[in-house]
């Protein structure tokens, strides 16, 4: 982004440099923006005129059927609900990987394209709120967090019973 701001990178003309999507929507109105201009109107849109997102991923939330109990988690709020679902959680060891989820669990409605959550994360207050939500989970005597960094670890943690729920990579 700095390289774009400093004129070191080439700026895209989205409609000239990229063809329309399979649905016929021109590039400047596409890029997962729901028809809003990705450079000016979309809150979670393109970070600069010199960059195009090329990776789309999701997080998997899993639980151990044998240790979770009769009630099963159904929402991201359940991941943080240690009264209803006591036990440790397995969370990826990255300071930013869990912030969106924490805000959703704390009551911020995602909005179209996650707009409300990303608006909150653009503020110091929103980031602090997300971090506090994760810290509360990790320090909860009914809960706690086990941080992982290798993709095979979440299933291992679940199978061993060390955690009752875990996040995992989608691939």
Language-model features: locations:
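A ligand-binding cleft/hinge motif common to bilobed small-molecule-binding domains
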Residues: 2, 167-171
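Extracytoplasmic ligand-binding site segments that recognize negatively charged/polar headgroups
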Residues: 1-157
């Amino acid at each position: 982004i700095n390289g774009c701001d400093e004129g070191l990178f080439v700026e895209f003309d989205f409609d000239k440099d990229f063809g329309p999507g399979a649905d016929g929507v021109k590039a400047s109105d596409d890029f997962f923006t729901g028809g809003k201009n990705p450079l000016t109107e979309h809150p979670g849109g393109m970070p600069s005129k010199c960059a195009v997102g090329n990776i789309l991923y999701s997080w998997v939330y899993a639980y151990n059927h044998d240790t979770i109990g009769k009630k099963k988690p159904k929402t991201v709020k359940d991941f943080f609900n240690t009264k209803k679902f006591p036990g440790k959680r397995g969370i990826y060891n990255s300071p930013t990987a869990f912030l969106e989820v924490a805000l959703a669990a704390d009551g911020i409605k995602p909005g179209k394209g996650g707009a409300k959550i990303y608006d909150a994360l653009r503020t110091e207050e929103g980031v602090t709120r997300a971090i506090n939500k994760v810290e509360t989970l990790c320090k909860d005597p009914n809960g706690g967090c086990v941080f992982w960094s290798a993709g095979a670890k979440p299933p291992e943690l679940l199978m061993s019973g060390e955690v009752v729920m875990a996040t995992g990579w989608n691939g």
